[in-house]
Regions:
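Catalytic glycan-binding domains that act on GlcNAc-containing polysaccharides
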Residues: 37-198
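N-terminal Lys/Arg-rich, disordered targeting/topogenic segments
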Residues: 1-18
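Structural motif marking the loop-to-transmembrane transition
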Residues: 15-19, 23, 139
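Short juxtamembrane and helix-loop transition motifs at transmembrane-helix boundaries
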Residues: 10-14, 28-33, 48-52
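Hydrophobic membrane-insertion alpha-helices, especially the h-region
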Residues: 21-39
Length: 198
């Protein structure tokens, strides 16, 4: 009887040991998943050296801030050249094919393969420059137009009486566009601060 009781206790302890190991494994898996999620956050993303050079060259050519250009790419695609949105925007800068075609006609830049960063980034940089000129260097309006389209931004300016100096991102009616502008400007500020520290 005593031997059977001891055996039973050992089995209980063994079972508890297995439960502890299972809980530890589960906790470890959750922590690993959380670490992957945190590290995949856009604030930790960095472009490859090749993409960094392409960003610098395109920004210089179009006379725009490299930090702004990188921040748009970061927000749009997290540097994924194969990114395709649910509405059909393609590549790192998430250009719609018809917009890319128009940019190509206006700029003379190729727009044959939008998944190629060497085509996509120069087209997007040209477009940002164009929008900044259209909106008198107002980055908020230019970024809103990049995301929601010029027609929408022009209509908002008319409907809400926005002027060239518009600065209240919270007034942007489309939630997606509002968050896009906030994300790009925050990333741009962070990138500029990092650059200043170097």
């Amino acid at each position: 009887m005593r031997t059977a009781l001891k055996r039973k206790k050992r089995e209980v302890h063994r079972h508890q040991g297995n439960t502890g190991a299972m809980l530890f494994t589960l906790l470890l898996a959750i922590l690993c998943g959380l670490a992957v999620y945190i590290l995949s956050d856009i604030s930790f993303m960095r472009p490859s050296r090749e993409i960094s050079l392409l960003i610098a060259e395109s920004a210089k050519k179009e006379e725009i801030s490299p930090a702004l250009l990188e921040a748009v790419i970061l927000t749009e695609s997290k540097f994924d050249k194969k990114a395709v949105s649910h509405v059909g925007a393609i590549g790192m800068m998430q250009l719609m094919p018809d917009t890319a075609e128009w940019i190509s006609e206006e700029s003379g830049l190729p727009a044959n393969r939008l998944e190629r960063p060497e085509e996509n980034i120069p087209l997007g940089a040209w477009y940002i420059n164009y929008l900044l000129k259209e909106y008198h260097n107002n980055e908020i309006l230019a970024l809103a137009a990049y995301n929601a389209g010029r027609g929408n931004v022009d209509q908002w300016m008319k409907d809400y009486g926005w002027k060239e100096g518009f600065s209240d991102m919270n007034q942007i009616p489309f939630p997606e566009t509002r968050e896009f502008v906030k994300s790009v400007t925050a990333s741009r500020d962070r990138l500029e601060a990092e650059q200043a520290e170097k």
